[in-house]
Amino acid sequence: AASQSAFSHTRLEVPVVVEGVRASNNVVIGHSCGDGATTIANSTVFPDGVDSTVKVDGVQTTNVVTDFVANWGNLNQKVLDHSVFPFEDEKNDPDGNVVGFWVKGGKMPNHYNAYIPFRAGAAIIEPESCATSVKFNIAVADICKITNIAGFADSKLNLWTPAVGSNYDGPGLYGY
């Protein structure tokens, strides 16, 4: 099974999918930034397989994603939906593979939930690997106020990102 997990309020509606099965899914925004703030945008990023951190049994390894996923590349695609955010697009790598998506222009109140649809492709575990399951951790930012990294605060954005030593998993910003 391929899966994603985050210990937070923003998550995937379907956190676990069966190997070889394509599925419709949603990034679920569980709340806004509080204090009357509205979520105006979201950015979601999938592992790109280029500089992704790969762990085996919780220990970082020099293996690459393709050592464990036979059909890596372009497994996810944004599903067009303007019901909450009127502007959206996919993020692509130089080869045109979808590595994430963004939405903006919304005004999701703190007491609402929002669903951002995408299609999760049918990942296939590399038969030559020892893997019996693969977990993909995604990075999600719910944005309430546009700011630079120095201005990051809970009242401006909510981050649910893997803690990999980047500027986006800093203290108090929910790196997991």
Positions of PLM-derived features:
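General secondary-structure edge motif
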Residues: A6-F7, V98
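N-terminal segment immediately downstream of the Sec signal-peptide cleavage site
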Residues: F7-G49
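Surface-exposed beta-strand edges and flanking loops
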Residues: V14, V103, I138-V140
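Extracellular Ig-like/FN3 beta-sandwich strand-entry sites
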Residues: R22, N113, A131-S133
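Extracytosolic low-complexity repeat regions of secreted or lipid-anchored proteins
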Residues: N26-G30, R119-E126, S133, A139
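Structured domain cores in non-transmembrane regions
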Residues: D35-E128
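Glycine-rich, aromatic-bearing surface loops/beta-hairpins
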Residues: P127-Y176
